[in-house]
Amino acid sequence: MKFFNNLFKKESKITVASGSKRVRISNSFLMFSNLYEAKKPLKYVLVYLLSIINAFLLLIFIQKTGLYSFGISSLTQGFARLVFVLLKSFDETQRLLIFNILYWLLYVFINIPLIIFSYKKIGKNFTILSTHFVVASNVFGFLISIIPGSDNLPPMLASITDTNFWKAAKDLNQSAGFVPFLWSDTSQGNVIISTFIYAAIYGFYNGISVSLLYILGGSAGGADFLTQYYARKKNRSVGSILFYVNSFILIIAILIGSFVAGSLLLQDVNNYRDSAWEVSLFFSPNLIATFFSILLTGTVVSYLFPRYNFAEIKVFTDKLEEVRKALLSDNANHSLSIQETLGGYSLLKKKMIVSVSMYVEIPHLIKIIRQIDKDCLVSITRIRGIDGHIYLRQN
């Protein structure tokens, strides 16, 4: 026993094998990890960039195809489509102006009480960042939509597809966006296929966009204010909540903007008069494609923004006490324990810090650790399940 005690106290010289060298490795299973600690100017630049892209894609993939976006915005889209149909006695220019005001700007005004709610219940920074996105994306969308000739803006997919798909996409683009496609109409086969492709593209993009907004500390507004509040209160993943809330709102939106508005149009068209007010008109390809898009968005958000997934962090450092004090001064109340280890080469007793943290907090913790010890080893292990109480940072 005395021999081993003396052995542990002795500094062992470790010979590095020939052909080996010490290298720095840094990887993360958290997507966009650098953006979690982004400075405020960069956050606003990215928010406005996302808002411009969002406005353009909404015009191309949603407004012109009869699809719907998600949350409360789908209600304003459905209402705008219904009003456009009801105002058939108005001049075409007036109808389009009213339609675009309702489609884009009404959503901003509906967000006002939700913004107040968010400011009081969630926080100042989150609400301000979200408000910038809501206002910017819808104002940009409105300005683009009133540009002369924007009604004839061709779909983005048209130039990279074959002749048949181009024809289908062109027909889709020129439709009013108010009449749902019919499963029974074989002539619309290519158009229905292109609708699902559009829904997939928008759903995937929207998942990335929403995730980036969450990572930056904001949201897309509307129902997001409510889902974020509920997710933080119940400590649940945002992705699944988004799907259920958006699905419920979407049913109402399609009932107004596609079923009612579409039936009012079809009853004046001889060839399709019998399809008006049919149940099949409600369960149209537009509905299924939009649901598919929502599901895809929720899946992408759950993957890119795993807020309530946890990981175990192990810190192997020679500056243990300083790192410990830095983590404690962070005021996040992380679980923190210190374990003894035995070096496999040196047979020296050392200590390491072990902590359990949410995925989204890992970049922040690593930043704190690196400020103390740039050469320490940080090991991160996924936790598949957890049962018990843990302190969570609320902002």
Swiss-Prot record:
InterPro entries: DUF2179 (IPR019264), N-reg_PII/ATP_PRibTrfase_C (IPR015867), UPF0750_membrane (IPR051461), YitT (IPR003740)
Assigned keywords, A-Z: Cell membrane, Membrane, Transmembrane, Transmembrane helix
Subcellular location: Cell membrane
Bilayer-crossing regions: 42-62, 67-87, 97-117, 128-148, 196-216, 241-261, 281-301
Any one Gene Ontology cellular component term annotated for this protein: plasma membrane
Keyword Kinase attributed: no
Membrane-related topology note: Multi-pass membrane protein
Protein name, as recorded: Uncharacterized protein MG443
